[in-house]
Amino acid sequence: MKNFLFVLLIALSSFSCNQITEPENTETSMNDVINDALTEMENDTSVKSFSSPIRYNDYIINLQTRVYEKIITLVKCFDTCDDKELRASYADFGEEAIATLKEIKRLGDYSGNTDFRDKATDLFAFYVEVYEGAYKELIDIVISGKMDEKTEKKMNKIVEEVSEKETALDNAFQIAQQKFADENGMQIIENDLQKEIDNL
């Protein structure tokens, strides 16, 4: 059963999980910046803004990474968890997906650029949609234990539909991120999380 969700994970991962680097090294780590930002916003509903383009990018990518980490945990859970633990892992993913969507919706533009944020919002909304729809359906099927040719075809169809939609959203996100990087004289590098996904 794991391979069905793993295929879905691959569809979700693509290569959008990237960081942007400036030509010179920055002393502040991404995690420190994000943790500071998250602490500030815990009880804040104001628009979130950044004075640095790299911090702006890293904030978006960190939100995405948080969701991916929950997806990876869920995929691993398929091999090692009982039904109760699987449901709990699924719920954790959902909570993170919903939380990150709320957070990205609070993010302002960066020097007039709204496209990067907007494409990220579309992608994060998709994570919530997958949680409420495709993942729930797949997990319900697996927990039911009723696996036959008809069920397998149904699962394959779900995965194909998710993959098709995600590909379009992810491509749009990557284009927007690249444009943002170009506008701000920065380079995109692969996120370490992508390597972890590739090694699953």
Label each residue range with its predicted role:
Residues 1-4:
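Positively charged n-region of N-terminal signal peptides that target proteins for export
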Residues 42-47, 73-77, 99-112, 146-155:
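Short, charged/polar, low-complexity loop and linker segments
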Residues 86-94, 117-122, 149-161:
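Short, charged, amphipathic alpha-helical segments
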Residues 119-126, 130-136:
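Long, charged all-alpha helical bundle/coiled-coil segments in cytosolic proteins
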Residues 133-200:
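A charged, solvent-exposed segment within the mature domains of Sec-exported extracytoplasmic proteins
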Residues 13-16:
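C-terminal motif of bacterial Sec signal peptides marking the signal peptidase cleavage site
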Residues 100-122, 139-142, 177, 184:
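Short, solvent-exposed, charged loop/turn and helix-capping segments
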Residues 20-91, 191-200:
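Immediate post-signal-peptide N-terminus of mature secreted/exported proteins
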